[in-house]
Amino acid sequence: MPGAVHSGFEAWRGMIPADALPPGFDLENTQLIWGRGAHAVLYPVRKGRYLNAVICARSRDRSLRLPRKGDAGVLLDSLRGWHPSLRQLFELVREWPVWPLLEMPRKGPWHHGRMALIGDAAHGMLPFAAQGAAMGIEDAEVLAAMVERHGTSEAALAAWGALRRKRVRKVVALARQNGRIYHMGWPFSMARNLVLGLTSPGNLAERQAWIYDWKP
């Protein structure tokens, strides 16, 4: 089966203790921040004891090693146009491991005989729709149903793949589209921000409602 390929993006990931955060910092919600050259996602982990900071940007290093040690100075220099409050927040991170963002080839097989790959192993995707783990859970649900119907045979795996491919491809396409939107350069980013400012939260949620409406 074909291996993973580099998507051209990388993710810098760092943890900040909650007690080091500025007073009043929102530790209840996930925050998505668009900036020049990158985007950031902030969300609480470990029952709110830490803030996980993830900064995604285009990568010059196309190696597949997992992960490499990031240079905080290089990262902060790349974010020099960002708001000072965000740069100060990122300065609280002690270590920045850098992960290459990988994808699996679209046309690769998901099973061979009675052996199968599911989740990221079969269809690793960009994290820009936050659906990689969810697709793995759905895979398991559908695979269990096909094994119940066909037994532990190759037919079960063939049926599972036929049922899953169309939906997974649609989610992969959405993640890639989000990546293009998140990393738009000037002046397209100005138009993006204008449209976003005129869009209600309900309409934004509706854009991905088809994902959450899925039934096995």
Where in this protein do the model-derived segments appear?
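Conserved FAD-binding catalytic core of PHBH/FMO-like flavoproteins
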Residues: 1-88, 93-94, 107
